[in-house]
From Swiss-Prot:
Name of protein: Ribonuclease PH
Positions that bind phosphate: 91, 129-131
Top enzyme class: transferase
Assembly description: Homohexameric ring arranged as a trimer of dimers.
CDD domains according to UniProt: RNase_PH_bact
EC number: 2.7.7.56
Coiled-coil ranges per UniProt: none
Catalytic activity: tRNA(n+1) + phosphate = tRNA(n) + a ribonucleoside 5'-diphosphate
One of the GO BP terms on file: rRNA processing
The species this protein was found in: Burkholderia multivorans (strain ATCC 17616 / 249)
Length: 246
């Protein structure tokens, strides 16, 4: 890492923002979490419905799906609610599909049974990394929803087969860095979002050069940073869920 690097936040190149996962944040949902990555704050809820989409009828398996949204003043300037505009943006659709894919990657859908877990991720304050924060928090909310089903005797075993978490990395002022905030994300040379399982498998890698192409060496460095950061996030998930020894 470049010792002369000066990140706007003062963090080291390989340093996460302060991350917090607060469980049972809302009253009604089977699982709910406030996830905080520095100044990025997202409420993630997991709601159980005893039905599945039409395309899964008679298949004997469950489903996880996600919706994502931002409050009008989650950013520096107010934006209209998508409901008021009458349609979702392409960005919103992309992010909520990503969240759903990430969670389904670590669920045994047959073990879930013919029911759906709806994940709702609502950004109340955005400072970069909202999609990766949403995935990391949504897993904890989904885990609590599964615990509710187990306690009610609706599941014979947990359908969760592994943890999943996500983080952003990028090349900022020529140096690979971990967990971009908005000040870095808006000025970085390369931006990458990485989703991984607790076992170290890759679920998704989204990488884009913002003008200057990145090298294979830089990509490897970014993936190494992401793997390290996600390892820390998975351990935090285990800690807040009381699974320290899992």
């Amino acid at each position: 890492m470049t010792s002369s690097l000066s990140r706007p936040s003062g963090r080291r190149a390989d340093e996460l923002r302060k991350v917090a996962l607060t469980r049972h944040y809302t009253k009604h949902a089977e699982g709910s979490v406030l996830v905080e990555f520095g100044d990025t704050k997202v409420i993630c809820t997991a709601s159980v419905a005893e039905r599945v989409p039409e395309f899964l009828r008679e298949r004997g398996q469950g489903w996880l799906t996600a919706e994502y949204g931002m409050l009008p003043r989650a950013t520096h300037t107010r934006s209209d609610r998508e409901a008021a505009r009458g349609k979702q943006t392409g960005r919103t659709q992309e992010i909520q599909r990503l969240i759903g894919r990430a969670l389904r990657a670590v669920f045994d859908l047959e073990a879930l049974g013919p029911r759906t877990i709806h994940l709702d991720c609502d950004v109340i304050q955005a400072d970069g990394g909202t999609r990766t924060a949403s995935i990391t928090g949504a897993f904890v909310a989904a885990h609590d929803a599964v615990s509710t089903l187990l306690a009610a005797g609706k599941l014979e075993r947990s359908p969760i087969v592994d943890h999943v978490a996500a983080i952003s990395v990028g090349v900022y002022e020529g140096t690979p860095v971990l967990d971009l905030d908005y000040a870095e994300d808006s000025r970085c040379d390369t931006d990458m979002n990485v989703v991984m399982t607790g076992a170290g498998g890759f679920v998704e890698v989204q990488g884009t050069a913002e003008g200057v192409p990145f090298s294979r060496a830089e990509m490897n460095a970014l993936l190494d940073l992401a793997q390290s950061g996600i390892g820390t996030l998975v351990q935090l998930q285990k800690d807040v869920l009381g699974l320290r020894h899992v």
